[in-house]
Amino acid sequence: MTDKIRTLQGRVVSDKMEKSVVVAIDRMVKHPLYGKFIRRTTKLHVHDENNECGMGDVVEIRQTRPISKTKSWALVRVVEKAVL
């Protein structure tokens, strides 16, 4: 069993909540029959303690203990700020 902490990168799609953001994670999946690669998106609720994220920011997140019913990811750092 490994104790490696799971980290992902994604784009912030909503920052309307207090201390929380919604991050969209894009991944490419191969179609089982036709072999074409399809883009799949997963939306995760992420804990943002200092409200430092904005819409469109690219962020790095890590898996953590459950903080609420839907939040079990926490913000590590803002990789790239969105251009307004």
Curated annotation (Swiss-Prot):
GO cellular component: cytosolic small ribosomal subunit
UniProt-listed PROSITE patterns: RIBOSOMAL_S17
Entry keyword set: Ribonucleoprotein, Ribosomal protein, RNA-binding, rRNA-binding
Signal peptide bounds: none
Keyword Ribonucleoprotein: yes
NCBIfam families the record matches: PRK05610.1 (NF004123), uS17_bact (TIGR03635)
Functional summary from the UniProt entry: One of the primary rRNA binding proteins, it binds specifically to the 5'-end of 16S ribosomal RNA.
Family in the record: Belongs to the universal ribosomal protein uS17 family.
Protein name (Swiss-Prot/TrEMBL): Small ribosomal subunit protein uS17
Organism of provenance: Proteus mirabilis (strain HI4320)
Organism classification: Bacteria, Pseudomonadati, Pseudomonadota, Gammaproteobacteria, Enterobacterales
